[in-house]
Amino acid sequence: MKLWGGRFKSETDKLMEEFNSSISFDIRLLKHDILGSIAHAKGLYKAGVLTEDELNLIEKGLKEILDETNVGEIPNDEDVHSYVERLLTEKIGDVGRKLHTGRSRNDQVATDERLYLRDEIDKIKEDLIKLIDTLKEMAETYKKAIMPGYTHLQRAQPVTFGHHLLAYVEMFKRDLSRLEDMYKRVNVMPLGSGALAGTTFDIDRKYVASLLGFDDITLNSMDGVSDRDFVIEFLSFASITMMHLSRFCEELILWSTKEFDFIEMDDRFSTGSSMMPQKKNPDAAELIRGKTGRVYGDLITILTVMKGLSLAYNKDMQEDKEALFDGIDTLKMSLKVFTEMIKTIKVKTDNMEKAAKYGYMNATDFADYLVSKGIPFRTAHEIAGKVVLYAIERNLAIEDLPLNELKKFSDVIDEDVYEAIDLKNTLKKKKTIGAPTSIQS
């Protein structure tokens, strides 16, 4: 069913119809298109455009379509809007043709997308909270498990695995904050903007918005139909969240190698090789890392679509939906898979602590010890560096060097140095808020 055609002399080319059609992907908006149409019909009734009987007939018909429609084979309509209107007209007759009064597909689809995204935000919020809670529980379990902290992927200073996990909790909390803040900009209704210049019918937009649970209405009709900032903002959020997942996955992949051997992935989230019998591959983590680029692509798609569009609506904007839907689907699945995967890893705490001990990661604490004895930090830093080199050449840890050898570097060094550079003590001595102390981890 076409919703236009009166001014055309010839039929649309079949190739153009196929090229123009969006029903294959915007059918996903069916529920929200119907909900928006029911609210619009009530607005038309309040404005005196529909009689009470007509409203009841339209509402009943739309609800039946929602209950009855099981989209298997993609219908042969231009888009979800024409599909719903065709079904309604077939069901209730010419009264169905009144539904689109005072409405354009331009404000209709913008409303549908906001309704849809609003629901998806609620689901993603639940997934993020579940991930954050999972990481917090694991951090409590491993709050005393010492491991190397890295800069430049080189061993730097000792931390705890619990503290490392809580670093990602902070990232995902920021993601959650972005998601919650975004909701207020998504939850604004453009319906009533018409094609671009409003409508002559006295539709109470705030009344319709209240029926649909919107907090507010858009205030400029041209912006209302052409705004896709909410899609861009969501995909920006999704890209940042996926980036955080990808960083964590990269670490898990590294840690699962024999070269690190800090963790072992569970069989349920690993795969094997068709040729090499010994292989156990961290495919779940690798796929999340790979799909991050896919979500970046979704964001770049809509940014590129929008960058050259004059006001108001342009058909280019049809291309926003597949990017939005793909970004939502990919993020949701990645969050679910990651949460289940991280819960099942085997953490090799002994290997982590061993790596921390033999990485000279107490060198900074050695320098701080010298400072506590009155030596300026720059001098202490140089002395500590020489001690590290001395220990490396002898294949020893700093704490394994005898006191008489340490005294060669400075006569302020005494027996208490060994307590100062003990790994567990170095962690306990960290005093600043946010440091990896047992309380904070």
Curated annotation (Swiss-Prot):
Keyword Membrane: no
UniProt pathway annotation: Amino-acid biosynthesis; L-arginine biosynthesis; L-arginine from L-ornithine and carbamoyl phosphate: step 3/3
Compartments reported by the entry: Cytoplasm
Known catalytic reactions: 2-(N(omega)-L-arginino)succinate = fumarate + L-arginine
The UniProt record lists the keyword Translocase: no
Gene Ontology CC terms, in alphabetical order: cytosol
InterPro entries reported for this sequence: Arg_succ_lyase_C (IPR029419), Argininosuccinate_lyase (IPR009049), Fumarase/histidase_N (IPR024083), Fumarate_lyase_CS (IPR020557), Fumarate_lyase_fam (IPR000362), Fumarate_lyase_N (IPR022761), L-Aspartase-like (IPR008948)
Gene Ontology terms describing biological process: arginine biosynthetic process via ornithine; L-arginine biosynthetic process
Protein's UniProt name: Argininosuccinate lyase
Natural source organism: Thermoanaerobacter pseudethanolicus (strain ATCC 33223 / 39E) (Clostridium thermohydrosulfuricum)
